Amino acid sequence: MNSFLLAREWGQEPNSSFRRQLLQHRLQRLALNPDVKIKRRHGAGILGSVNALSIDNTIHQLMVSGGANSSINVWDLQNIDQKEDEDLILDTLNAVPARTSHKFGITDLHWFPFDNGIFTSSSFDHTLKVWDVSTLQEAYTFTMEDMIYSHAWSPIASHCLIATAYRSSSIRLCDMQSGSYTHSLSGHTGNVLAVDWCPKNEFVLASGSADGTCRLWDIRKVSSSFACMDLHNKYLPSNQTNISHYGTVNGLAWTSDARYLASCGTDDRIRVWNMESGRNTLREFGPIIHNQTTSFAVHPCMIQPSMDSDVFVLFPNDDGSLALLNLLEGSFVRRLSTHSLKRINCAAYRPDFEQCFTGDMNGNIYMWSPKALKSPTKISDLETRRNIIQEVYDSLINIPVTYQ
């Protein structure tokens, strides 16, 4: 890092390069923040588990959490930014008590991409609800035939479609403007657990299923998927019988430029797909992924500090740890641990603030931030310290000289 500072002073490195390296360095120093404690607000015992977290997409100030006891809590993260004391206990801003709206556990939460006044929640009770944050009242409710594993908004779309993955081999599209369903996407042969919209094309949707396939859809067409990823790269993506994982595909995440799609499955593997060719990049992260979740979708945190920087992934593991990975290099960076054997159910990254929040089976929400470097010693402190060498020297020169 000192070499970058020196190069910047000499004008040898552009500011963007220095900023990129600084952000990546800080990301690699993520650690539990001991100064911020977040109150447990989702009950006790097994029903106190935190199943979902989401941070608003506009100013990154509000966070919503959902528990296994069906409660929903809204948190104001600005209190963290404005804290003056060393220790802060963060409490909820508003809450939906257990069993007052959803009847069973929350499975997924997402903010409306263009407004932090709306968020959505899905549950084991077969419903998808749209919420008004100011009143914390339901605006719409969509009811499915079975439990909902996950759902997703498009980050760029002109439409207001919400893709839902529920205990079915098809994907249901819900239109928030009309309050009704538009159509279903059929092609999987097992339950669909994960869905995620392409960040560059508002009509392209990715899905992952218990049949071991990761598929791409054009929602303007009612036909089957236009691509099915092949982990062996033997067949073209147009082959509908390809296999993507040796197990259930339970998580998906796009890079911000949509050039790559990451999928994770119960085979304890993360695969990185090149979206220009549809081929498996064959990135291997080693035996550090522990992922056997089939109750709801896993949401890996895709982190790219700047458009020209490396892409990192924070992956919540079943063993209570977070794995920090360099996605395109296929390398393991470091393991972040809460010293608990209870699995981390969810993780949410707060852009521009370099903070990460995680929720676990114990009902805890933790905050992670770059570990602070030790402050350099002040000159004033050095001046007040006892200088033994100087004292010895002074004592020697002050000895009177005598002549025999």
From Swiss-Prot:
Xref: PROSITE patterns: WD_REPEATS_1, WD_REPEATS_2, WD_REPEATS_REGION
WD repeats mapped onto the chain: 45-85, 101-141, 187-227, 244-283, 339-378
Database matches in PANTHER family: DNA EXCISION REPAIR PROTEIN ERCC-8
Compartmental location: Cytoplasm
Protein name as it appears in the record: DNA excision repair protein ckn1
Record remark on domains: The DDB-box is specifically required for ddb1-binding.
Pfam families per record: WD40
GO biological process: proteasome-mediated ubiquitin-dependent protein catabolic process; protein polyubiquitination; transcription-coupled nucleotide-excision repair
Function: Adapter protein for ddb1/cullin 4 ubiquitin ligases involved in transcription-coupled nucleotide excision repair.
Motif (DDB-box): 1-19
Subunit structure: Interacts with ddb1.
Native species: Schizosaccharomyces pombe (strain 972 / ATCC 24843) (Fission yeast)
Gene3D superfamilies: YVTN repeat-like/Quinoprotein amine dehydrogenase (2.130.10.10)
Keywords recorded for this protein, A-Z: Cytoplasm, DNA damage, DNA repair, Repeat, Ubl conjugation pathway, WD repeat
This protein's GO CC annotations: Cul4A-RING E3 ubiquitin ligase complex; cytosol; Ddb1-Ckn1 complex; nucleotide-excision repair complex
